[in-house]
A protein has these predicted regions:
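Extracytoplasmic metal-acquisition and chelation regions
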Residues: 1-114
Length: 114
């Protein structure tokens, strides 16, 4: 993937969660299935945070496509952090790893290797 990015060809990034929408509660419409079916790589946090998108991806992705759950790959269950908006009883962490530079570096490494 890094080589393709460096060459400047072949990459189209499509976000499926509309701007201003809570990605944790987003229920993807059927049109998202079409986007997922065309993808070579689908990147999500994982960690139980986008289950409807993950389920739709698994049901619609083409053969050879990769589902990359970056948070699941980087953050161990023993490292999960819970807070008022993501209580432990709910079973889903509040990683916000994208605001932590070492975590972001790990995320990028996982995506590169996917």
């Amino acid at each position: 993937m890094a080589g393709v990015l460096a060459a400047g060809t072949g990459i189209e990034v499509v976000g499926v969660v509309p701007e201003g929408t809570n990605s944790h509660t987003f229920e993807p419409p059927p049109s998202v299935a079409r986007e997922l079916a065309e993808a070579d790589l689908v990147v999500v946090n994982g960690l139980g945070l986008e289950d409807p998108i993950i389920e739709m991806a698994q049901a619609n992705m083409k053969d050879g496509a990769v589902l990359c759950e970056v948070g699941t790959a980087v953050i161990l269950r023993s490292e999960w952090v819970f807070d008022f908006s993501f209580p432990q009883e709910g079973g889903r962490p509040n990683p916000h790893a994208w605001t932590n530079p070492p975590s972001v570096l790990s995320y990028v490494t996982v995506m590169r290797d996917a």
